[in-house]
């Protein structure tokens, strides 16, 4: 099955129109960029040198902490996370 060459040229024409460019710019500006900045702050929190120097990283100190599970059966998403995390999760699902 061959594609009609008119379909290809029509798709190129639509992509080159200013309306499509503004839609893509709006998508990047409104969804992708804020999500990237939020993820950076969420996964790599800011630490001061005083806090880092006071951390005990021995195996004994780590073994005493409780294990947290990502998902547990029988609980809804709202019960497991606070409102900020749910908002972040829904916002990052745009990507």
Curated annotation (Swiss-Prot):
It is a single-pass membrane protein. The chain crosses the membrane at residues 20-38. This is Stationary phase gene 1 protein. It is found in: Mitochondrion membrane. The gene is SPG1. Keywords: Membrane, Mitochondrion, Transmembrane, Transmembrane helix. It comes from the Eukaryota. GO terms for cellular component: endoplasmic reticulum; mitochondrial membrane; mitochondrion. Induction: Abundant in stationary phase (G0) cells. mRNA levels rapidly decrease upon exit from G0. It comes from Saccharomyces cerevisiae (strain ATCC 204508 / S288c). The keyword Membrane applies.
């Amino acid at each position: 099955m061959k594609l009609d060459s008119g379909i290809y040229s029509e798709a190129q024409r639509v992509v080159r129109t200013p309306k499509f460019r503004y839609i893509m710019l709006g998508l990047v500006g409104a969804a992708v960029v804020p999500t990237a900045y939020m993820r950076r702050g969420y996964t790599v929190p800011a630490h001061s040198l005083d806090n880092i120097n006071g951390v005990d990283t021995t195996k004994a100190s780590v073994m005493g902490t409780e294990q947290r599970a990502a998902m547990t059966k029988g609980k809804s998403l709202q019960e497991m996370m606070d409102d900020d995390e749910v908002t972040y999760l829904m916002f990052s699902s745009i990507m």
